[in-house]
Protein backbone atom coordinates (compact mmCIF):
# COMPACT_ATOMS: atom_id res chain seq x y z
CA UNK A 1 0.00 0.00 0.00
CA UNK A 2 1.31 3.46 -0.94
CA UNK A 3 0.64 6.49 1.21
CA UNK A 4 0.47 9.80 -0.64
CA UNK A 5 2.07 12.83 0.95
CA UNK A 6 0.43 16.25 0.76
CA UNK A 7 2.89 17.13 -2.03
CA UNK A 8 1.42 14.34 -4.16
CA UNK A 9 -2.02 15.99 -4.30
CA UNK A 10 -2.71 17.37 -7.78
CA UNK A 11 -5.64 19.69 -8.48
CA UNK A 12 -6.88 20.91 -11.87
CA UNK A 13 -5.75 24.28 -13.22
CA UNK A 14 -9.00 26.28 -13.33
CA UNK A 15 -8.39 27.84 -16.78
CA UNK A 16 -7.92 24.46 -18.44
CA UNK A 17 -8.94 21.66 -16.02
CA UNK A 18 -8.94 18.95 -18.70
CA UNK A 19 -5.33 19.60 -19.65
CA UNK A 20 -3.23 20.63 -16.61
CA UNK A 21 -2.89 19.96 -12.89
CA UNK A 22 -0.87 21.73 -10.19
CA UNK A 23 0.50 20.45 -6.87
CA UNK A 24 1.32 22.19 -3.56
CA UNK A 25 4.96 22.67 -4.59
CA UNK A 26 4.06 24.67 -7.69
CA UNK A 27 4.72 21.95 -10.24
CA UNK A 28 2.46 21.69 -13.29
CA UNK A 29 1.77 18.47 -15.17
CA UNK A 30 -0.22 17.48 -18.21
CA UNK A 31 -3.45 15.69 -17.37
CA UNK A 32 -4.50 14.75 -20.88
CA UNK A 33 -6.33 16.80 -23.45
CA UNK A 34 -4.35 17.91 -26.48
CA UNK A 35 -1.61 15.28 -26.35
CA UNK A 36 -2.62 12.23 -24.36
CA UNK A 37 0.86 10.77 -24.80
CA UNK A 38 2.17 13.52 -22.48
CA UNK A 39 -0.30 12.72 -19.66
CA UNK A 40 1.46 12.86 -16.29
CA UNK A 41 4.53 14.66 -17.62
CA UNK A 42 5.69 17.44 -15.30
CA UNK A 43 6.24 20.68 -17.21
CA UNK A 44 9.59 22.46 -17.15
CA UNK A 45 9.50 25.62 -15.02
CA UNK A 46 11.02 28.85 -16.27
CA UNK A 47 11.81 32.11 -14.54
CA UNK A 48 10.86 35.61 -15.60
CA UNK A 49 13.13 38.65 -15.23
CA UNK A 50 11.88 39.31 -11.69
CA UNK A 51 12.55 35.75 -10.49
CA UNK A 52 8.98 34.39 -10.54
CA UNK A 53 8.43 30.77 -11.61
CA UNK A 54 6.40 30.70 -14.82
CA UNK A 55 4.98 28.02 -17.09
CA UNK A 56 4.03 28.10 -20.74
CA UNK A 57 0.70 26.33 -21.12
CA UNK A 58 -1.76 26.01 -23.97
CA UNK A 59 -5.19 27.53 -23.39
CA UNK A 60 -7.70 27.25 -26.24
CA UNK A 61 -4.84 26.33 -28.61
CA UNK A 62 -2.85 29.47 -27.73
CA UNK A 63 0.32 29.46 -25.65
CA UNK A 64 0.11 31.58 -22.49
CA UNK A 65 2.50 32.37 -19.65
CA UNK A 66 1.16 31.69 -16.18
CA UNK A 67 2.77 32.34 -12.79
CA UNK A 68 3.17 29.19 -10.70
CA UNK A 69 2.32 30.97 -7.43
CA UNK A 70 -1.01 32.19 -8.83
CA UNK A 71 -1.89 28.73 -10.17
CA UNK A 72 -1.13 27.16 -6.77
CA UNK A 73 -3.11 29.78 -4.84
CA UNK A 74 -6.07 29.57 -7.21
CA UNK A 75 -6.22 25.77 -7.02
CA UNK A 76 -5.65 25.31 -3.28
CA UNK A 77 -6.92 28.57 -1.72
CA UNK A 78 -9.67 29.42 -4.19
CA UNK A 79 -10.23 32.16 -6.76
CA UNK A 80 -8.12 35.29 -6.26
CA UNK A 81 -10.33 38.41 -6.10
CA UNK A 82 -9.37 41.24 -8.46
CA UNK A 83 -8.45 43.57 -5.60
CA UNK A 84 -6.13 40.97 -4.03
CA UNK A 85 -2.70 39.56 -4.85
CA UNK A 86 -0.65 36.49 -3.93
CA UNK A 87 2.22 37.23 -1.54
CA UNK A 88 5.33 35.10 -0.97
CA UNK A 89 5.69 34.98 2.83
CA UNK A 90 9.46 34.44 2.73
CA UNK A 91 10.03 37.05 0.00
CA UNK A 92 11.46 34.42 -2.38
CA UNK A 93 9.60 34.81 -5.68
CA UNK A 94 11.12 31.53 -6.84
CA UNK A 95 9.32 29.57 -4.09
CA UNK A 96 5.72 28.96 -5.26
CA UNK A 97 4.89 26.30 -2.64
CA UNK A 98 1.52 26.58 -0.95
CA UNK A 99 3.04 26.93 2.53
CA UNK A 100 4.81 30.09 1.32
CA UNK A 101 1.75 31.78 -0.20
CA UNK A 102 -1.02 33.98 1.11
CA UNK A 103 -3.68 36.11 -0.53
CA UNK A 104 -3.43 39.75 0.59
CA UNK A 105 -4.85 43.14 -0.38
CA UNK A 106 -3.09 45.27 -3.00
CA UNK A 107 -0.98 47.98 -1.51
Give residue ranges: language-model regions:
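Conserved recognition-core residues within compact binding domains
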Residues: 1-86, 90-107
